[in-house]
Amino acid sequence: MQYKKSLVASALVTTSLAAYAPKDPWSTLTPSATYKGGITDYSSTFGIAVEPIATTASSKAKRAAAISQIGDGQIQATTKTTAAAVSQIGDGQIQATTKTKAAAVSQIGDGQIQATTKTTSAKTTAAAVSQIGDGQIQATTKTKAAAVSQIGDGQIQATTKTTAAAVSQIGDGQIQATTKTTAAAVSQIGDGQIQATTNTTVAPVSQITDGQIQATTLTSATIIPSPAPAPITNGTDPVTAETCKSSGTLEMNLKGGILTDGKGRIGSIVANRQFQFDGPPPQAGAIYAAGWSITPEGNLAIGDQDTFYQCLSGNFYNLYDEHIGTQCNAVHLQAIDLVNC
């Protein structure tokens, strides 16, 4: 697979020209193109699972991994997963693990979203991603089914080498997931970041006040019953995967092309090209804050693009809409219905 070889520095320079200033109408921060056949309104709450593009032709199961969110809104996911769900932490960031077989991405409190890498099959026993307080989303690596939680800053983190890991959310919105899990669920912390543990089989993740989402390691997984699919407001429902919803799981809503998390923060592509949740309004310098859709294939898209990149940051990955470095892998963010189990 061919990747774009752009430098982070050059990306920051070129994108800063159209960056969002706090007084600007952020709802107009949309890409110039739209995804053909994409759904811009979805009537049900849904999560996302990270599916590496190299393995999207593998299994198309009915149950996928949800991503959690931590408090800061960041979202992170694991790598080499089969079906890992990502959580969200408080800052809104989303992060996922690495070397998972199906890793879902979580969200932490600051709204950032991160997903795992090298995942194989999601949609059957997939992992949901959690959110931490800052909105970032992060996932672990080498998990087989790691769930990601959410911490207060919104970051989301998830594990790696997971088969079905759910990600939680922490307070900052970041999303992170664990690594080497088989089916770990991630919780949410206050900043929105989402983080998950490593070496877990199925570990549920909790949420801390900053929104970050973190999950334990060396846990085991359970089978999820199959409820009715979620309704949509236009077109044919493209979402064919589902996973159990738990505390801290990254929960998203799509209305009029605007993506929000469970705390009402805005899903955006920020100045460094990272996907996270902030605000409202989105953080200063944001590039896109609208123009989201679900593709006919069931993937999350921004504009006419449904390819995202999970880039290694320590023991987790952050999610970006562009290839920003050598340790980045192309992924799809698969939409999955969240059900009460």
Curated annotation (Swiss-Prot):
Main function: Component of the outer cell wall layer. Required for stability of the cell wall and for optimal growth. Required for resistance against several antifungal and cell wall-perturbing agents and for tolerance to heat shock.
Propeptide, chain numbering: 19-63
Cellular localisation: Secreted, Cell wall
Membership in a protein family: Belongs to the PIR protein family.
Chain's gene name: PIR1
Placement of PIR1/2/3 repeats on the sequence: 64-82, 83-101, 102-120, 126-144, 145-163, 164-182, 183-201, 202-220
Source species of the chain: Saccharomyces cerevisiae (strain RM11-1a)
Superkingdom, taxonomy of origin: Eukaryota
Entry protein name: Cell wall mannoprotein PIR1
